[in-house]
Amino acid sequence: MPSMPEEPILTPTPDRFCMFPIQYPQIWEMYKKAEASFWTAEEVDLSQDNRDWENSLTNDERHFIKHVLAFFAASDGIVLENLSTRFMSDVQISEARAFYGFQIAIENIHSEMYSLLLDTYIKDNKERDHLFRAIETIPCDEKSRMGYEMDQRISKLR
C-alpha cells in the first residue's frame, strides 16, 4: 500500500505547545476573527420573548421553532464531541488548536443558548424534557444519534 503524504497540520511537533512565533498567519487570522465575535448567553435579552412566543406566533410556528431548537441543542453536543475528541487530539498546529479551542467555547455558548431558549419558552416540564432529549425522543434527531454512534464505531477501528 502506498504511503500517505505527510499532513503538516497532523504532524506532531514541539512547536504546538507555544503559540508564537506564528507560523500559519491565515489560520491565526481566523482565530482572531472568531475571538472578536465572542458573546455570552447572558448578553441576549429574552425579557420580551415570552410575550411574543405566546401572542405573536401560531401553534405551527411554535412547533417548528421548538423542534429546530431541540435539534440544535442536541446537535451541538455532537459537534462538541467531535471538536474535543477528534480535532483537538489530531491537529498539531498551535494556531489551529487555538481556533478549535475557541470554537469549542463558542459551541458551548450556542448549546447554552438553545437550551436557555427552550427553558424560557416551554413551560411544561414533560415537554421540555422531551425536547432536551431530542436525540433520543424525536425521530429526525434520532438519525443524528445513529450517525454519531456509527462515527464512534468507525473511530475505534482506526
Swiss-Prot record:
What's an example Gene Ontology biological process for this entry?
deoxyribonucleotide biosynthetic process
InterPro entries named in the record: Ferritin-like_SF, RNR-like, RNR_small, RNR_small_AS, RNR_small_fam
Q: Which Pfam families match?
A: Ribonuc_red_sm (PF00268)
This protein's source sits in the domain of life called Eukaryota
Q: Which GO terms describe its molecular function?
A: oxidoreductase activity
Q: Which PANTHER family match?
A: RIBONUCLEOSIDE-DIPHOSPHATE REDUCTASE SMALL CHAIN, RIBONUCLEOSIDE-DIPHOSPHATE REDUCTASE SUBUNIT M2
Query: Member of which family?
Result: Belongs to the ribonucleoside diphosphate reductase small chain family.
The name under which this protein is listed is Putative ribonucleoside-diphosphate reductase small chain B
What species does this protein belong to?
Answer: Arabidopsis thaliana
